[in-house]
Amino acid sequence: MNLNEKLAVTGLVPVVKLKSADSAVALAEALGKGGLKAAEITFRTDAAEESIRRIAKEFPDFLLAAGTVLNCENADRAMDAGAGLIVSPGLNPKVVEHCIKKGYPVMPGITSPSEIELAMSFGLDTVKFFPAEAMGGVKMLKALSAPYGNLKFMPTGGIDSGNLQSYLELPCVLCCGGSWMVKGDLIDSGNFDAITELTRQAVDSMLGLKLERATLNSNCGAELKEHCGKLGMEFSDKECGACFSCNDVQRAVWYMEQRGFEIDPTRLEYDSKHRLTKAAFKAGNAVIRLEKK
């Protein structure tokens, strides 16, 4: 899985400002418990480099981006510390050229067609749309992306649980950046349980899992059948199971695999654009199905 594929299945990258590197590992652990093994650590404080280094050492599989990288020196420091991606609020040609020369994955910020075309002239296929809401939000991004069908965006700025899905539904959006689950006061007070819970809520909202129907086979007790039948549950002589609808099947599959579910490769279905639309997981003698809403 390449970097863009990892970003796509992750869907949401927490944007973090850490005042002290001593909070870095606990924060990453809290995010992971909530379902997100990713973070953009911003170079808005002197703790960024060491924070990246500590997280990379403790959690090697964490998707780590360095944010607010404004110069070549910070790009080098971030990558040496263990970052896997350089992100900046704007497009500084000198920084982009330096990153490309060094082989660093880089995602500069853009707000106009001119900046998009400059990014494309460097051979980039993914950019950051920042500040997303202040620049017109979903409506602006739809218009901005229209002429550039192969370009992907990571909108960041003003995104929260209320508008996240409206961005992720856009075909041009690879993933989103957000900070509402990693608020500064929660980090400063060490309230990592709250960060875990907010992260879990964000992931649940992003996946949008909803039980659509369930099936019980003939081995289930008659009384259980009777009561479950009143709830609209179906019955089958072959298997027990449940079917959930979700916002994005590929993303939901990835998250379920992270939680230990075993996918059934014989039950994958794709649409004409090769996007996963249906999947199934083994759950003992039962089957859990996923389908796109």
Question: Model-found features: residue ranges?
Answer:
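Catalytic cores of alpha/beta
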Residues: 27, 71-81, 114-122, 159-174
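N-terminal beta-strand motif that seeds the catalytic metal site of vicinal oxygen chelate
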Residues: 3-17, 203-224, 231-244, 293
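Structural preference for beta-strand elements that scaffold enzyme active sites
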Residues: 11-15, 38-40, 61-65, 84-85, ...
